[in-house]
Amino acid sequence: MSETEFHHGAQAGLELLRSSNSPTSASQSAGMTVTDQAFVTLATNDIYCQGALVLGQSLRRHRLTRKLVVLITPQVSSLLRVILSKVFDEVIEVNLIDSADYIHLAFLKRPELGLTLTKLHCWTLTHYSKCVFLDADTLVLSNVDELFDRGEFSAAPDPGWPDCFNSGVFVFQPSLHTHKLLLQHAMEHGSFDGADQGLLNSFFRNWSTTDIHKHLPFIYNLSSNTMYTYSPAFKQFGSSAKVVHFLGSMKPWNYKYNPQSGSVLEQGSASSSQHQAAFLHLWWTVYQNNVLPLYKSVQAGEARASPGHTLCHSDVGGPCADSASGVGEPCENSTPSAGVPCANSPLGSNQPAQGLPEPTQIVDETLSLPEGRRSEDMIACPETETPAVITCDPLSQPSPQPADFTETETILQPANKVESVSSEETFEPSQELPAEALRDPSLQDALEVDLAVSVSQISIEEKVKELSPEEERRKWEEGRIDYMGKDAFARIQEKLDRFLQ
C-alpha cells in the first residue's frame, strides 16, 4: 500500500476529529454523570504521565459521562501527582511491595511481571461496577461511552495476530475474586509475551470463539503505525476511528513538535508514515492546548477552586475508597507509610502557591501559546462533588529511569495540518494544590521530565540522574526500589550473571 493511500485515510480521520465535539447522547447533553463507572489508565513514571494527561484531556474534550481514574506507581513525582489530580477524578498509587500478602507473594514469585501486576490492580476498583481500561499511549478521537454497554471481557483484535486481543483497550468488571484468579494464573503460567497482553489472553483464552459481542470493532483500537494490508478497508473505515493506539517503542512524547508549522521532529533514523504523522500531530495539539496550561497554572499558583479529586494510596489489594466519601473518612483499606499517619490533609484554600519551583524549562518565554489562541479555549477539569482531597501517603521522591535518545532528527510534516479543535464547553480548573506539594522544596528536582517550550519547538525528555552508591543503598533501605526500570528483575539478573562468570 502506498503512502498516498494512508494519507487519504488519515485525512478522513482528521475530518472526524473536527466534527466530534457535539453531544452524542441525551445523557451527555443533560450533563449527567454515571458515578459507578469509570475510564481507567496507568502511568508508571513521569514520562507516561504525559500520555495519561493527553488521554484524560481527550476524553474530557468529548464530554464523557463517566469518572476518570489513573493508577500510578511510587516512581511518579509529587508535581505530576498534583497535575494528574487536575484531570482525573481519582489518582491511586499502587505499591506492590506494601500490598496484601497474596499480591506481594505473586510479585515475589514473578518479579519480571511487575508492570503487568500493577495493571491488573485495576480489578480491585470495586467501588465501580464496570470500567474501560485505556493504555496511556492511546488518544480518544470521539465519545466512546457506548463501550460501557459491552460486557467483560471485551477488546479489539490485535493487528499482529487477530485471534488474540490487544490489551490497550478493554472493558472489564472490577472484582477481587477475578483479581486473585489473575494473580494465581500469573504465578502458575506467567505470560507468553512477558507482559499483560499475553497473560490476559491466556486467562481469557476463549475470547476468540465464545462471544462475538465481546469483539470490539477495530475503530476502538486503531494502531497508528501498523502497515495495514487491506488498504481499501482502511480508506473506507479509517475515518470512523474512535481510539488511536500508538503501539511500538516510539511514543508521541519521544518526538519533538513545532507548534508553528505543526510538524513532528523524529528522534531517530526511521521515518514514520504520513498517516502516523497526522495522528502524532493530533496528540501534540492536545498536549499543547490542554496539558501545558496545567503546568503553567500550577507554576503560577493559579489553581484555586473548590476542593476536588482524590489522591489515594491503594496498596493492600482491597478497593480504594469511593472518592465521594464524606469529609474526615480515611482512605479505605490504605496502609500509611512508616512514621507517617494516614491523614486528611487540609487544603488551605486561601493560601497562595508560594515557593513552588518552576515545572518547565522555558527556552523562549516570549510565546506560550500560538498566535490567536485564547486561554478560554483551554480545557481543564470539571468541578467535582468530592468534598476534600484525601492523601494517605506522603508524596515520595521517584527514582530516575534512563532514557535512550539519539541525535538524528527527521522532520515529519503532518498529512493535513488541522486547526486546533476547541471544546464547546470550557472547564475551569477545580483542583486545589495539596498543602504537602506547596511546601515541598524539591518539586523541581523530583520531576523526572524536562519540558522545553519555545516558539519553534516543544519537547519532553526524561531526566537522567546518576545516583551515588550511598544514595542507591538509601533508596533500597527506604523501600523506594525502581522495579520498573533500573532495579528491574532482568537487570539484576544480568549483574548476578556477570558476577558469577
Swiss-Prot record:
MF GO annotations: glycogenin glucosyltransferase activity; glycosyltransferase activity; metal ion binding
Entry annotated with the keyword rRNA-binding: no
Principal subcellular localization: cytoplasm
Residue(s) at site: Important for catalytic activity: K119
Cofactor(s), names only, from the UniProt record: Mn(2+)
Organs and tissues of expression: Detected in liver (at protein level). Expressed preferentially in liver, heart, and pancreas.
Post-translation changes: Self-glycosylated by the transfer of glucose residues from UDP-glucose to itself, forming an alpha-1,4-glycan of around 10 residues attached to Tyr-228.
Compartments (UniProt record): Cytoplasm; Nucleus
Pathway(s) annotated for this protein in UniProt: Glycan biosynthesis; glycogen biosynthesis
Entry keyword annotation includes Transferase: yes
Record field: catalytic activity: L-tyrosyl-[glycogenin] + UDP-alpha-D-glucose = alpha-D-glucosyl-L-tyrosyl-[glycogenin] + UDP + H(+); [1,4-alpha-D-glucosyl](n)-L-tyrosyl-[glycogenin] + UDP-alpha-D-glucose = [1,4-alpha-D-glucosyl](n+1)-L-tyrosyl-[glycogenin] + UDP + H(+)
Pfam families hit by this protein: Glyco_transf_8 (PF01501)
One Gene Ontology cellular component: cytoplasm
Effect recorded for G194R: Found in a renal cell carcinoma case; somatic mutation
Sites carrying sugar chains: Y228
Known outcome of mutating Y230F: No loss of activity
GO BP: glycogen biosynthetic process
Residue positions, PTM Phosphoserine: S368, S399, S459
Enzyme class, UniProt record, top EC level: transferase
Binding sites annotated in the UniProt record for UDP: L42, T44, N45, Y48, R110, D135, A136, D137, H245, G248, K251
Subunit structure: Homodimer, tightly complexed to glycogen synthase.
Family the UniProt entry places it in: Belongs to the glycosyltransferase 8 family. Glycogenin subfamily.
Known function: Glycogenin participates in the glycogen biosynthetic process along with glycogen synthase and glycogen branching enzyme. It catalyzes the formation of a short alpha (1,4)-glucosyl chain covalently attached via a glucose 1-O-tyrosyl linkage to internal tyrosine residues and these chains act as primers for the elongation reaction catalyzed by glycogen synthase.
Protein name stated in the entry: Glycogenin-2
Gene: GYG2
